[in-house]
Amino acid sequence: MISRFFRHLFEALKSLKRNGWMTVAAVSSVMITLTLVAIFASVIFNTAKLATDIENNVRVVVYIRKDVEDNSQTIEKEGQTVTNNDYHKVYDSLKNMSTVKSVTFSSKEEQYEKLTEIMGDNWKIFEGDANPLYDAYIVEANAPNDVKTIAEDAKKIEGVSEVQDGGANTERLFKLASFIRVWGLGIAALLIFIAVFLISNTIRITIISRSREIQIMRLVGAKNSYIRGPFLLEGAFIGLLGAIAPSVLVFIVYQIVYQSVNKSLVGQNLSMISPDLFSPLMIALLFVIGVFIGSLGSGISMRRFLKI
């Protein structure tokens, strides 16, 4: 069994070398196909991840007017410290909503610090200026469906300047994810079909060049599985070789994109898929797809031209 495998392996490698240019064309086709598959898969999976993150961040941001001190029990008035009659009016109105899970205060100073962390040196141009941000309440909803209701009710509360919710963004992101998924998978399927076709032609040339040898093998009683072996290995090798470059690109490029993009998402409680999880799974998937389309192309040629 082992000796037969190595014999098939040797025949497959010899055939790949013999049909050099066709092998290069088939490997290049697989490489381009898998590279584009990796790109589409990265976009599809991360878009779905971001859409899920947004949906899970079932919250509304309620900004307080600058002339309202809702989170302070005392205020400065005419040089004196007096009791704040507006204390927690907005907070209590939000907290008393039946659809609200929690309400958390976020001062404009805290928001300024977060923006400084996210923007880095770009935010330094505003140093020395008055803080343009607003105090806000972060309202967490009991369920995603409650977000719009909370946002509408919050707009009616006196002292509220603006209300933001992720409903529209989530809906747009889901539409984008659906669009990318449909067209991305369609294009990937077309590319895989082209790769299978080229591999099939490469194997066909090998079959034609060895047709007499194959006929003799059949006459002396060689089993179909024995005849198929070298050709299936040849197709698998083409797929395997074509998966190497896309896998290297995934490992390097995804790390760079993650480090560049993800830090701007963290401030919004969003995140791309971690490279430690995504890269190994994507690389394994590329090799599996490569071997599959290589073997499939080989199988199609054998079925069509050998009739075995």
Curated annotation (Swiss-Prot):
Domain of life: Bacteria
Impact when changing N131 to A/D: Shape defects; cells are significantly shorter and rounder
Effect of E109A: Shape defects; cells are significantly shorter and rounder
Predominant localisation class: membrane
Biological process, per Gene Ontology: cell division
Sequence ranges on the Cytoplasmic membrane side: 1-24, 200-236, 298-308
Membrane topology category: Multi-pass membrane protein
Ranges that cross the membrane: 25-45, 179-199, 237-257, 277-297
Residues in compartment: Extracellular: 46-178, 258-276
Pfam families membership: FtsX, FtsX_ECD
UniProt keyword RNA-binding present: no
Keywords of the record: Cell cycle, Cell division, Cell membrane, Membrane, Transmembrane, Transmembrane helix
Family annotation (InterPro entries): ABC3_permease_C, FtsX, FtsX_ECD
Location of this chain's protein in the cell: Cell membrane
GO cellular component term of the entry, any: plasma membrane
Stretches of the chain forming a coiled coil according to its record: none
NCBIfam families according to UniProt: FtsX_Gpos
Family listed: Belongs to the ABC-4 integral membrane protein family. FtsX subfamily.
Subunit structure: Homodimer. Interacts with FtsE; forms a membrane-associated complex. Interacts (via large extracellular loop) with PcsB (via N-terminal coiled-coil domain). This interaction directs PcsB to equatorial and septal sites of dividing cells.
Function as written in the Swiss-Prot or TrEMBL entry: Part of the ABC transporter FtsEX involved in asymmetric cellular division facilitating the initiation of sporulation. Required in maintaining normal growth and cellular morphology.
Name of this chain's protein: Cell division protein FtsX
Source species of the chain: Streptococcus pneumoniae serotype 2 (strain D39 / NCTC 7466)
